[in-house]
Amino acid sequence: MITNTKIFGNSLDKDIDKEFFDEYALAPSEFAKVFHVQSAPAGDHYTWSELSPLGQLREISEGGQVEFDLPEAGHKVTKYYRIFGLGFQITAPMYKDDLTGNWKQMPRKLAKSAGQKPDIVAFDVFNNGFTSETSADGQYIFDVDHTTLKSGDTIANEPATAGSLSETTLQAGFEYFDGLVDEAGNPLNIQPNKLLVPIEQKYAAQKLMKNVGAIGTANNDLNVVSPTNGIVNDYMLHVSRYLTSSTAWFLLSPEHMFTFMWKDQAALSSTDDFSTNNALFKVWMRFAAFCLDYKGAYGNPGA
């Protein structure tokens, strides 16, 4: 966009930098509260390969031989970093004639765009987790037929029938973790500690977490998904503005593998356009957001 002597862009650099990074620092960030954030290793991509655990120890008789086991070579996946950028232009007359400092709104608006983009891209991993985003096994992140490498167990971290957030459907999410096994079929002792919901579900989620008694009944039944009753472990609520479905919700354990990798954080640069004398400013960043292994997360698309 153009907002319109001699080269003058360098004289604006300090002002633009200050306006941009002051606003960028204030931009609320959600993804870091949900994703595991890492600095990217060298190179233009990240490769991860899976190796199954070993099986359980076998009983041997006195003088008997120990049986040797081998892990299963697993899935291998490569993730490439994506580049995002945007810029604006200021003309010399605009800068000189703007007595009220309106031009300062432009770096602030650019900072807001830069601050939101990582959140949008990161939470799209959840938004598309039922339909296009895949984990290392090639299945959708949330699916009904993941298969373990060594034991051949079928794992469903999505219900066969989608359902609205309720005591019954949330209980099914906790039960998923109770019955979870690793790639060798051994029990996995992981429990969810975070319920991720869109803004439309925050009231229903709070009721489920805080009500001691079962919701919507006059009986004295316990609300089994309230940590107060000691049936499920404590968990926290995260309400996201970036979940695009008004019904989908997710349970996450600390061991989940939703990963955000920074390759290059926001960098602001400037130059002058020789043909127009406009001062050009741009910001760019490079990162990747993905899920490597599905087991630490349960998702329900809702209804």
What annotation goes with each model-predicted range?
Residues 118-154:
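Glycine-rich, mobile lid/loop segments that gate access to catalytic sites or pores
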Residues 59, 78-80, 93-94, 140, ...:
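Residue-level preference for alpha-helix termini and adjacent loops
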Residues 19, 72-73, 180, 266:
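Short alpha-helical segments and helix-capping/turn motifs at coil-helix boundaries
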Residues 1-27:
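N-terminal alpha-helical "arm" segments
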Residues 20, 24, 28, 32, ...:
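Residue-level signal for secondary-structure boundary elements
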Residues 2-8, 142-182, 186-194, 199-303:
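Sequence/fold signature of self-assembling virion shell proteins
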Residues 76-133, 195, 281-283:
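Long, contiguous amphipathic alpha-helices that act as assembly "spine/axial" helices in icosahedral shell
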Residues 25-84:
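Assembly/oligomerization interface modules of large self-assembling protein complexes
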